[in-house]
Amino acid sequence: MTDAPSVTGWQIADVVAAWPETPTAKTLRLKLAEPWPFLPGQHVDVRLTAPDGYQAQRSYSIASSPADAHAIEITVQRLEDGEVSPYLCDVLEAGDQLELRGPIGGYFVWRGEGPVLLIGGGSGLVPLMSILRHRRLTAPDVPMRALVSVRTPGDLLYAGELGDDARLLYTRAGPPGWAEPPRRLTPADVADAAYPDGLAFVCGPTGFVDRVADLLLQAGYPAERILTERFGPT
Amino acid sequence: MSGGFISRGFFGKRRPPEGMEGRLPPGQYYESGFPVLTVGPTEKIETDAWTLRVDGLVEHAVEWNWNSFQALPRTTYEGDIHCVTKWSKLGTNFSGVSVDELLKLAQPQPEAKYVLATSFGGYTTNVPLADLVDGKAWVADTHEGQPLPREHGGPARLLVPHLYFWKSAKWVTKLTLLAEDEWGFWERNGYHHRGDPWKEQRYTGD
């Protein structure tokens, strides 16, 4: 197994573009002063500094592919009572700068193995999108599919970019004309999507990840081939 | 370091409560809940299948089952915990059996300098032996008066509160004393081999 690229020091990145993905999530495209290589699934630490010197750090997954060499993208889900995400979503805009370090993490990373099942809940889709995008750009022959669970169409990130390789599930309400009633992922959904001898990447809120990891175990995945990343304020 | 960079329009709103300012290590924020972060599935270990073993460079490898573990003298940790994902929980408490108590029975050999903790499910983390002795570490089965919940590592987890919390292995089942440092799961995956939050030792090389 190749080592994942390891973290470098703090640097200032230029926000070269910023756009909303949903009413409550925003993508920031960041040009690094000192670019580094990374693997899909790795994240960055962001550090904000107030005028009085107070600092706040948080981690954000990279959404873009490493093959997109000119900049990296992070997608930030705005947490209502958050400290950093409302700043990144509401205040920061193209032309600003952001201090960050990366790339971080050598566990929840895709090194090109296949086949791969991606299961994302809500904003847990962000690191999975890096994997999907990287596969499309560099390894289209690797079998890969995604199960994406969101509450409503308004919570779906990258809606225009998810194609036949992604299956969508709505837990509260689907779009107009959606054939299925709102529901959670079932054992059958996971069993139908499972690949024998594959890897599974699961990312989302803690309860979602726990539930999906159990469904994957039931579908025959050994624990060591279930990679999880849990999100969430509590 | 960036020396003087100010984030335009950022003023911050998670400063620690009054009187607790000195208790937040650099880069940490105050969290009143208890977030759950785990590698892989959450383990389900019944107490009648639970065992804890201390082995490696010891005079006597010792294994406890749930009942014999419960018979050991217990102490309580009152204080703070710090997760490398940036949250700190201030003023909490855990109780269980101190690692000193376990080592009293196992008796470390003089060349033992490091410990590799192993969990049900295979998670590992390495800790210098010096960080586990003299009242600094526990195998804890109780959090704030309640049995430790499964998602927080119940029935019992290692508790090393002066290091980042990934060192406090959930569902711990074995402590192996070693002469040489052997890196655990996160330590092989980009995280610091010791993890002192006051020195902000988050990642390899920090």
Regions found by a protein language model. Name each.
Chain B
Residues 2-206:
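Structured, non-membrane catalytic/scaffold regions adjacent to prosthetic-group chemistry
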